[in-house]
Amino acid sequence: MTEQTIWVGAVAYDPKVVTIWEGMRHYFRHEAGVPVEVVLFQSYEAQVAALLADGSTVMPRVDIAWNTNLAYLQSMEWSARECRPLVMRDTDLGWTTRMIALAGGAVASLEDLRGRTLAIGSQDSGHAAILPRYFLDQAGLVADRDFRLLQFNTDVGKHGDTGTSEADVLRAVLDGRADAGMVGSPFWAGVQARKLVPAGAVADVWSSPPYSHCMFTARPGLDADVARKFSEALYAMNFDNPAHRQVLEAEGLRTWLPADVGGYDSLTDACHRQGHFLRPA
């Protein structure tokens, strides 16, 4: 094992996160030979603060954080880009936001939103709130001017990871409180795969341009060799290995990839425009 323990932060948005990181820690320590310890947080705000902590206060400090796209971008912005993106999942590429509406209803395109009600998710969800508002603005559709907004601020602090606010959006579309709703493509794919709504009842009427989701992010000043060993251990996980597959499937991927920062431009612009880069006091 390397001598330096690597402290990794993750947000416990679901009980399965404990199981995932028990498996990840076991892999790192007992197979990859990398001494990792895990700190679980209740919010991404707390995790980002720990990633940026300088060690001069009693605040916990982590070396690497498993961040959402919003938390990754905030880490970069608030560290003057001294944080470093490391590794992401294959499934973090190519996310989209989908607008859903009752099949055969009044909304079949973005333009049909004029004068109607749109449901969106939690205010800190990139895929269910921040990017939907951004893409609508780009299309010339402004909330409270061109359409009414029904927002579900459920599980704020989890950045939409729980999917609870997206479930609220779907319910609002089904019961008529909203004419349409915005959800992330993985949530919508899950609804369809599990047949959670009657076949043909709800239609996917619009898709956003693609963007990227999560990113392992290194703190400012983390030794490059430490970051490399952590990253290489992730790359060595093999989906064909049953022990690895159990953890990989739980985390929703087949393989780990080097950081590809090209899929964050739209969210970066949205965060600047909507004030998500204003650092908490």
Each predicted region: which residue ranges?
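Extracytoplasmic small-molecule ligand-binding "clamshell" domains
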Residues: 1-73
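An extracytoplasmic/periplasmic, membrane-proximal ligand-sensing/linker region
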Residues: 2-10, 15-23, 211, 218, ...
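Short helix-initiation/N-cap motifs at beta->coil->alpha
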Residues: 38-55, 70, 144-171
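Hydrophobic residues within well-ordered alpha-helices
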Residues: 50-58, 113, 173-174, 230
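A ligand-binding cleft/hinge motif common to bilobed small-molecule-binding domains
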Residues: 66-80, 137-138, 167-199
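Short beta-strand->loop
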Residues: 82-92, 145-152, 193-210
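Hydrophobic/proline-rich hinge and linker segments of small-molecule sensing/allosteric domains
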Residues: 86-109, 216-219
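Flexible hinge/capping segments at coil-to-helix
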Residues: 101-118, 122-123, 143
